[in-house]
Amino acid sequence: MQEFLLPVIKSALQSAAIETDKPVQIEKPTDKKNGDFSTNIALLLSKECRRNPRELAAELIGQMIFPDGTVERIEIAGPGFINFYLTPLFIMQSVEHILLEGKGYGSSCAGKGKTAIVEYVSANPTGPLTIGRGRGGVLGDCIANLLATQGYGLTREYYFNDAGRQMQILGESVRYRYMERCGRDIVFPESHYQGEYIREIAEILFLEHESSLIDSDNLSIFKDTAEAIIFSSIKKTLARIDIRHDSFFNEHTLYIAEGNGKSANDRVLELLESKGFIDRYDGATWFLTTKLGQEKDKVLVKSSGEPSYRLPDIAYHLDKYRRKFDLIVNVFGADHIDEYPDVLEALRILGHDTSKMRVAINQFVTTTVDGETVKMSTRKGNADLLDELIDDVGADATRLFFIMRSKDSHLNFDIELAKKQSKDNPVFYLQYAHARICSLLRIAAEEAGFKPDGSGAHLLQKLTLEPEIQLGFTLLDYPEVIRTAIRLLEPQKMVEYLHSVAEQYHKFYQECPILKADPDIRTARLFLSLATRQVLRNGFTILGISAPESM
C-alpha cells in the first residue's frame, strides 16, 4: 500500500530541487504511534544537501500534495523521520479493492512476458522420499506459486538423477535381494540399500521372471525396474501434498554423445579448459578453483573415470541457460551448500549472467514427539519417510509446518502439535479463521439476507473503530508480503502474515459485534469479513493448503 506514497515523495524532492540517486525507503513502523508509514529520506539526504534533517523534512512535507481524504496528518519525529498517518476512510476505500479483485488480489504483471524455472525435490530415485526432501519440495512449490502470482511463464522442474554410481548400487541391491529370494545364500553388502522396499522390488521381479535372471549379467533389468517403481512411488507421494512437476530432466542425457560426438559433460570440460580452468593430475580431472581463491581444486572426473556431481550439475545449469529463462531458481538441501558455489563459478567463467540464478537452501528436519526426536520409519530402513508423516498428520499440516520456519533454520517438526485441534496448532488457527468467516456469512445470509455481491461494500467507509481499521490495514499489506516473500525466496513470510491476519480477525470478531450491529455497520463488518476471507484464501492457495468452510 505504501506505493501510493512513493510518487508523492519523489515529486516533493523535485519541487524542492533535490536530485539524488538514493532510493526512497518507506517502512511500516512496528509502533502505530509512529504512523502507518515512515520514511528516512530527509536523514539520508541531509549531508549532501547540507541541511538540518528536520528542516529538510519540514520543507519536503510542505511540497507534498496528497489526494483529499487519504492522509490524516504528517509528523516529523526524532532526528528527521517523516511519519504518515492515513485516514480510516482511505484505508476502507482501499479494502473495497480487495473485493473487486477477488482471486487476483495480490497478483501483478511484474513477470509478464518473462519465463522462470523452479527446480525442486530432484531426489535420486534410489528410495522412498524422506522428510528432508519433502521440506524442499514444499518450499519449491510455494516459491513457484508465488512467482505464478506475478505473471511469469513458469516451469516446475525435477532433475532426475538417473545416472552415476548410486544407481548402479541400487541395481546391485535389488539383484542381491532377488538372488536371496531365489534361494541363493548371499552376503548383502552394508554399503548397499537396506530398506524393505528393495525386497519388495525383488519380489516383483521374482513373480514376473521366477529364477530366470539369477545368473544374468544384465544389471539394467534390476536397475531399470527399481528406478521405474521408485520414481512412480515418489510421484505419488508428492501428489499427496499437491506437488506436481511439468518437466523432468534426466541426468543420463548429459552423458549421451550428440551429433559432434561429444556429450554435454564433455562440452563443459572443453569450455572450462579453453578458459584455463581444467587440469589433470592424480589420475583425475580437476576444476581449478584455487585460481578463484579457494583452498582446493575440485574433482570433476574421478580417477575411475566417473564424473563427480559437479560436472553434470554444471552441464545441467548450462542447459537451463540454453533454454533462455529470465529467472532460474534452485531449491537445494543443506547437503548442497559446498557444491553450488562451484557451479556458479563455472557459469561465470563461461560468461553467463548468474544474477538471474537464485538459490534457496533449506536446512534439515527433525521429527519430535513430546520434545524427543523420533524416527517416522521402523520398516523401510533408517530414514524418516514423507509418506508416513503425511499418514500421521495430514497433507495440510505437512505443508504448513515445513514452511512455518525460515528455510535457513533447522526445523523441529512437532508431530503432536501438528495433530492438535487447537489454536496452538498454526494450521488449525489459520483454517479456523477461514471457517469462522464462512459460518458467519452463512448465518448472515439466512438471518439478515446478506448478499456478498459487492452492492453494499461502500458501507465499509463507515468503519472507524481501532480493531476494524487495524484489520483493514493489515489486509492491505498482502501484495507487499508477496513481493517480500519472492525477494527473499521465503514463503515463511506468507505464513507469518496470514497468522497476523487471523489474529487481527479474531480480535475484530470479539470486540466488534457483527450480526447484532445496526444494519449499515453490520453490512460493513460483513464485507470486511468477506475481504479477510479473500486474503486468507489467496494466501492458502500460495501455501497449497485447503480452505475449509466448517470445522
From Swiss-Prot:
Catalyses which reaction(s): tRNA(Arg) + L-arginine + ATP = L-arginyl-tRNA(Arg) + AMP + diphosphate
Motif ('HIGH' region): 123-133
GO biological-process terms attached to the record: arginyl-tRNA aminoacylation
Domain of life according to the entry: Bacteria
Cell location: Cytoplasm
Subunit structure: Monomer.
Name listed for the protein in its UniProt record: Arginine--tRNA ligase
Organism encoding this protein: Chlorobium limicola (strain DSM 245 / NBRC 103803 / 6330)
Source species taxonomy: Bacteria, Pseudomonadati, Chlorobiota, Chlorobiia, Chlorobiales
Protein encoded by which gene: argS
